[in-house]
Regions:
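Ser/Thr- (and often Asn-) enriched beta-sheet segments in non-cytosolic proteins
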Residues: 12-18, 50-52
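Short, intrinsically disordered N-terminal pre-domain segments
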Residues: 1-13
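Short, surface-exposed, charged amphipathic helix/loop patches that serve as local interaction elements
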Residues: 25-168
Length: 168
């Protein structure tokens, strides 16, 4: 077959998150795990909370973006976000020199991206430790862990939605 197809949106996998105290890994192991989803990339993960996620279809991803405000997001903010330097110091200086309306547009777009991530997780998260996910993601504490969990789950969701389980 010469054409490539997206994975089935019913595809599910179990993942853990690296902020879980039961997970042990170096920064390199963490990156390898996030890139591949291979639990063997982690030094240890026994007893970690397991998240069962499903792949999202293009329609699912589009609906998540719409619910997050795709039609009202700041286009100036989107352009600024794309143009932002990758070096942290350079980015800080660049951000400092933005006009007030540009800073507001960028902040608005970043808030939109956060809403997209939350919507993607709401649709894709099936279970947490074999229990229906419901609103459990909103009850993770501390807040810094909740944000990291969402961020890592989105990376896994995007990978399996676009590349499938073996996608690297």
């Amino acid at each position: 077959m010469a054409l490539s197809f997206l994975p089935d949106s019913e595809l599910t996998i179990e993942v853990v998150v690296t902020c879980d105290p039961a997970v042990t890994c170096s920064p390199e192991q963490m990156q390898a795990y996030l890139d591949t989803g291979e639990l063997s990339a982690l030094e240890a993960h026994e007893g970690a909370t397991r998240f069962k996620i499903k792949a999202l279809s293009p329609s699912d991803r589009e609906q998540a973006e719409v619910r997050a405000g795709a039609y009202t997001r700041s286009e100036l903010g989107r352009i600024l976000w794309l143009d932002a330097p990758s070096d942290e110091r350079e980015k800080a200086r660049w951000h400092h020199e933005l006009a007030e309306d540009e800073r507001e547009a960028l902040a608005s777009y970043q808030a939109y991206l956060s809403r997209v991530f939350v919507e993607m997780v709401r649709v894709a998260l099936v279970e947490i430790d074999d229990q229906p996910a419901g609103d459990m993601i909103d009850r993770i504490k501390p807040e810094s862990h909740r944000l990291q969990v969402i961020s890592e789950l989105v990376q896994h969701i995007q990978r399996i939605s676009l590349l499938g389980i073996s996608g690297k």
